[in-house]
Amino acid sequence: MEELYNGIRLPDVWPPRNMDDMSLSELPVPYLENRPDVALIDVGRQLFVDDFLIEENWLEKRFHQAVLDETPVLAPETPMEWNKGVAPVAAPFTDGCWYDPADGVYRLYYHAGWFDGTALAVSADGRHFTRKMLDNQVGTNRIFVPKPGWQRDGSCVWLDQETEHPEERYKMFHYFRTPEGDVAQVAVSADGMHFGDPVTTGLCGDNTSFFYNPFRKKWVFSIRTGLPSTPWYSRGRSYYECDRFMEGASWANDQIAFWQRCDVRDLRESEPGTIYNKNLPPQLYHLNCVGYESVMLGLFAIIKGFDQAHNAVCENSGVPKHIDLHAGFSRDGFHFSRDNRSPFIRCTDRPGSWARGYLHACGGLCLVSPEE
């Protein structure tokens, strides 16, 4: 039985195979239901985001929303990003943003041109970014060139500051649409600008991503999964972990475990006054995580409504999918407490706003630099 840094003991069967994917009941958080006799507080600052460290409580717990700057750090400018005027894009589609202490700059990996490039922009302050021209394709800031006919979908780039292998310092996942069918691949890089030969992963859906659990030294893949219990299509997440990123990426179906979904407490409205289809519940569109102080922080991307869940409806109506980002917290890296069901980052339906509709968490979630 593995004992974690905080005194929690994991069961012999790990990851658990008992998460309910057949209903909308709340998912369990075992370490809150049966707390260890002694909670260890030696790792990281202790965050009172749940009741794990609280013996008695007569206070009101209050969560706060993020305050957004309406001005984007990137907007489509280059021919690749403008994509001949068809769905221009210069934004993370997960991808990643990191402060790299090796060269003292912030690196933003982003989706450049719809279903096209994965590009790199750099910044000295994390707010003002310039495109880093690279030699992978002359005149562009692509970090790699896809095969002819291959179109990128979701992507994730991670800076691994704990690796003992310098050539694997940057790790990347891509989901591709190809003439032969969809495929997902991983690759590694020493400099985050030139990646080596890829390895094909196990089966997964688009918007799959990965993260590093620093408390258990595990690489975890957040795998898009359809729920079997509903008469409509509903999204959830499955979980797969490994010790070595490249060697462990080719998982078999029986190695993954059902992980997370929405439940009866998830809100069926988002912006005040905006009500979506109440006949069908919200869906878990994505889940990205990062180790933060003494917990794993997760951002649950929850899609609201039903009609907008279909791409054709969105395209015909000119309205993007409505996705808000909700915060969750885990002390074992698998089970999440979500006491607050209001969005941490709320999208808007306001036409012309950069925060309209289709919000995605960036790989790494939050930046930690020498100053803040």
Positions of the model-derived regions?
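Beta-rich carbohydrate-recognition and catalytic domains
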Residues: M1-Y285, V290-R356, P370-E372
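Extended C-terminal regions of large enzymes
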Residues: H360-C362, S369
